[in-house]
Amino acid sequence: MASPQVIVLGSGNVASHLLEAFVAAQVSCGLWSRNCGHARALAARVGDDKVEVFDCLADVPRDSFFYVIAVSDNAVAALIEELGPVEGVVAHTSGSVPLQEPFADGRYGVFYPLQTFSSDVSVDMSKVPFFVEGNNPAVTELLKELAALFGANAYEADSLHRAQLHLAAVFASNFANSLWVVAEGILKDAGYPLDVLEPLLKETLRKAMAYGPRQAQTGPAARNDTKVLSRQMEELEGIPLEIYRLITELIRSQQMPPDETENKEIQ
């Protein structure tokens, strides 16, 4: 029996979405996870007849084309070492873990999808940008071909640039979502649901992508409406108040020409 073309190692959110994308693209897949129950449940979801599950890492074939390691950042290096030398390309999916090369003669790389994943939310993987790095140019090209199997675009990014991409994503996604939590609390206190903000959020994103976020910035800080700023700060306390002050300072600085930018603290 021929070995699967792609072995996915892991059964979390990233592993799940990648496996589904490969299976949908008619790629023969194998799956391994330290949690055998999770692996079998994932295989059942995408189709038991389409995925070969390996209960033991030692049973994973060594002659597959790709080994995609989709585990937590702090588990990547240990799993690569535990897997040992294989014939195919070994690539992890982390944006913040550098390229791993534990074996002198192997082919290693990074296959980083710039997207947030949840177990219960479907993602069109063909629209997710992948950032790839190989330990040689041939491996980099192979990783681009791997993304192309399900129609995704792949861009080259070394460890430094990948870390910058990850940092940008933290600001754009994680921090923004945290602010939505604050907004949700304010709305709840006023008796309104979060979905009243949905049209605003969609239009904010549309304008940011169409015109650039600096040009699309609106609100009391952008127009330096000190009366509104003061009134709103009176309604806040603790960390939300400090965040309001800091972000207002940031917005003000972003609206100034570079030679006029100065650090003005809000009172």
Q: Residue ranges of each PLM-predicted region?
A:
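Phosphate-coordination loops involved in phosphoryl transfer and adenosine-cofactor binding
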Residues: S3, E87, K127
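Rossmann-like NAD(P)(H) cofactor-binding subdomain of soluble oxidoreductases
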Residues: C36-S122
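Conserved SAM-binding loop
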Residues: I7, L31, V68-I69, V132
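NAD(P)+-binding Rossmann beta1-loop-alpha1 motif at the extreme N-terminus of oxidoreductases
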Residues: M1-A58
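Amphipathic, non-transmembrane alpha-helical scaffold segments
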Residues: V68, A169-A172, A176, E237, ...
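NAD(P)-dependent Rossmann-like dehydrogenase/reductase catalytic/cofactor-binding core
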Residues: D195-Q267
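Internal alpha-helical scaffold of NAD(P)-dependent oxidoreductase catalytic cores
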Residues: L18, A25, G37-R45, D105-R107, ...
